[in-house]
Amino acid sequence: MGTPFKMERGVKYRDAAKTSIIPVKNIDPNQELLKKPEWMKIKLPANSAKIDSIKNGMRRHGLHSVCEEASCPNLHECFNHGTATFMILGAICTRRCPFCDVAHGKPLPPDPEEPRKLAETIQDMKLRYVVITSVDRDDLPDRGAGHFAECVKEIRQLNPNIKIEILVPDFRGRIEQALDKLKDNPPDVFNHNLENVPRLYREIRPGADYQWSLKLLKDFKAMFPHIPTKSGLMVGLGETNEEILQVMQDLRDHGVTMLTLGQYLQPSRHHLPVARYVPPAEFDEFRDKAQAMGFEHAACGPFVRSSYHADLQAKGEIVK
């Protein structure tokens, strides 16, 4: 028998090193991929002074953006717009979802200075709306909830007029403890992504539980009825439209009023392949049905991501 694979703490495992240890091994890096349709082709602009400024500001304070770590296709647009989604608690995730480009591994302990550095960076950037997300930290007793709370507290102390959206993991097995940590420093928008349909969870979200994620959204809403709750979904992973509509209804049944729906894009050949490219007209239909279900805001489009133009979503403007 060969030597068992042993991860080193603080090392980022990506692509084949990451997806080789998922429970459902159905990724063939040599398989023929679907050709991107014209509506999925975007022209990336050359790096601008605004993009360089945001990147340099993050590097200077030792911070991370999910825009870079997850290889988001909207990075250039958002950075040029002067917005970014900050990723706290390091850049190594304890989960190994095969749709995601964030590195897997054994993360380092949280940086106790990160909340202060984050608040100072946001102040320097003169942001009015900020999204804070994180990797999964199943290694921490509170799954990182206390660190989220400290970040919100520090940001508000230096930026009293800012609006804060947090995009949180599922706090596996620690929902009650996590919400207790957040109760004194709640955000302006609480976001937790269901990602896709429950039938595909074992394949695409190993370690997650669909009902647990719904419970997190419902329990937060019960604790803070005045704060909007939000969730995001990807399409193109093998789900049916009927399954997506059922997930949307489940979200409404659990008090969620904001929805994002976008096309899944394969980060590399070592990730799950795209099963289908959904035409823009179908996204328009999803948005119409979301509004009919009672969602107050529904951003639906091929390039929509959970934090894409989150400031405009929060204002109720149409994003697609």
UniProtKB/Swiss-Prot annotation:
It catalyses: [[Fe-S] cluster scaffold protein carrying a second [4Fe-4S](2+) cluster] + N(6)-octanoyl-L-lysyl-[protein] + 2 oxidized [2Fe-2S]-[ferredoxin] + 2 S-adenosyl-L-methionine + 4 H(+) = [[Fe-S] cluster scaffold protein] + N(6)-[(R)-dihydrolipoyl]-L-lysyl-[protein] + 4 Fe(3+) + 2 hydrogen sulfide + 2 5'-deoxyadenosine + 2 L-methionine + 2 reduced [2Fe-2S]-[ferredoxin]. Keywords: 4Fe-4S, Cytoplasm, Iron, Iron-sulfur, Metal-binding, S-adenosyl-L-methionine, Transferase. It is found in: Cytoplasm. Pathway: Protein modification; protein lipoylation via endogenous pathway; protein N(6)-(lipoyl)lysine from octanoyl-[acyl-carrier-protein]: step 2/2. Residues 79-296 form the Radical SAM core domain. Its cofactor is [4Fe-4S] cluster. GO terms for molecular function: 4 iron, 4 sulfur cluster binding; lipoate synthase activity; metal ion binding. PROSITE patterns: RADICAL_SAM (PS51918). It comes from the Bacteria. Its EC number is 2.8.1.8. [4Fe-4S] cluster 1 binds at C67, C72, C78, S307. One of its GO terms (cellular component) is cytoplasm. It is an enzyme of class 2 (transferase). [4Fe-4S] cluster 2 binds at C93, C97, C100. Binds 2 [4Fe-4S] clusters per subunit. One cluster is coordinated with 3 cysteines and an exchangeable S-adenosyl-L-methionine. Belongs to the radical SAM superfamily. Lipoyl synthase family. This is Lipoyl synthase. It comes from Pasteurella multocida (strain Pm70). The lineage of its organism: Bacteria, Pseudomonadati, Pseudomonadota, Gammaproteobacteria, Pasteurellales. The gene is lipA.
